[in-house]
Amino acid sequence: TTMTGDWNGTRTELAEKGIKFDGTIAVDGSYLADGGYDAHQAPTFGTQFGVGTTLDMQKLAGWNGVTVRALVTARQGESTSLRGIQDPTAPQWANSQANWGRGNSGSRLSELYIDKKFDSGWDVRLGRMGLGTEFNTMACDFQSNAFCAAQMGKWQGKLWYNTPVSQWGGRVKYNLTPELFAQVGVFEYNPENALERHGWNLDTKNADGVNILSEVVWSPKQGLNDLAGSYRLGTLYNTADDAKNQYDVAYAAKTVGEDRSYGGWLAFEQQLTSTGAGRQGLHSFGNFTFHDRTTTAVSDSQQLGLKYYGLFEGHPNDILGFAVNRVQINDRYRDFVNTTRTNPANVQQYNKTLLNKDAEYNLELNYSYYPAKWLMLRPLLQYVVYPGATTQVDNALVVGLGSKFIF
């Protein structure tokens, strides 16, 4: 069910022929109620619009197992993290509004790929896509990007671009069993793709190496307590060798070049109790990332959370959620920043905010309410401890309201 309905039956007719359309508008609203760097400013809103189509080429052209997917997105708005929570010289590591990630953009080509599934268990996908739609995938049932989408794209985001940013590449998946698959992917690394003004950049002239990803995913239908779960283990290897893109974070940016970087993740989602049909009941999830300490300002992160589906009778899709995230700052990077800022000889950096804590912590409590299948409203509270990994900025209390429309 969508906000625009079935278009007098046209939508169903097109779907039966192999043509499906989808569209969403998501709005993240945040207000810094207390603490942070500059509280009590006006609320900010980050908005994402997306419209896409999925073509079943078997129905349209007789191509067995072939699907074509296209998605265009646009993001506009402002960020409470930037405007109120953070000291500009010690940015918050997470962001209160996931839909503000990568800033504003008039429009972007976020997906354009062809996928072929083989009877032998192989699945090949080629084209443009975001890394987080293929690897380290995670639901977005929270507004903070510390709990939304592939966490590798946040903590190693200099190299890893999630949707809405896309890049050329390919992914090969092999289903070893109905519950276990392995996949590898190779994607261009092109910093130009992330720029707000290059949402439709299709050339590779500014590419610098590639991202090589691998992942094993086990999704038992009867795991813990005979309930479904999903477990992911993966790695990232990047081959960029231009010092402006790949450099040692213990020195001034872009001065000591490196020729590789790596990272890894372990993620899970496991249903713990069942109180009805489908997903109803208590679910747990977690995401743990590890990063190259030579080239990455974040050394590791930990995320744990709980979601309860269908807490109230008659609302099986509603979700009560709570999650905690810890972002560990690379001590090599932190020591360099603090040494620079305590040296009077460094006129531009001297006396700027010190990163005097080793981590930032993000918490969110929310309730995702579905008054209709096409509408979600999400009141929420967020609390940020040591924003920017410093005690020189107060802990921040954020009140928010997210919404999503499906049309």
Language-model features, listed with the residues they occupy:
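Residue-level signature of outer-membrane beta-barrel architecture
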Residues: 14, 27, 55-59, 116, ...
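Short loop/turn motifs that connect adjacent beta-strands in outer-membrane beta-barrel proteins
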Residues: 4-21, 55-68, 120-121, 179, ...
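Transmembrane beta-barrel strands of outer-membrane/channel proteins
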Residues: 23-29, 68-74, 124-128, 184-188, ...
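Residues that define the transmembrane beta-barrel architecture of outer-membrane proteins
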Residues: 3, 17, 31, 43-49, ...
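Signature for the C-terminal beta-barrel architecture of outer-membrane proteins
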Residues: 121, 153-293, 297, 308
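Outer-membrane beta-barrel "beta-signal"
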Residues: 322, 395-407
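Outer membrane beta-barrel transmembrane domains
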Residues: 201-202, 215-218, 234-262, 269, ...
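Outer membrane beta-barrel
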Residues: 42, 46-191, 296-301, 311-338
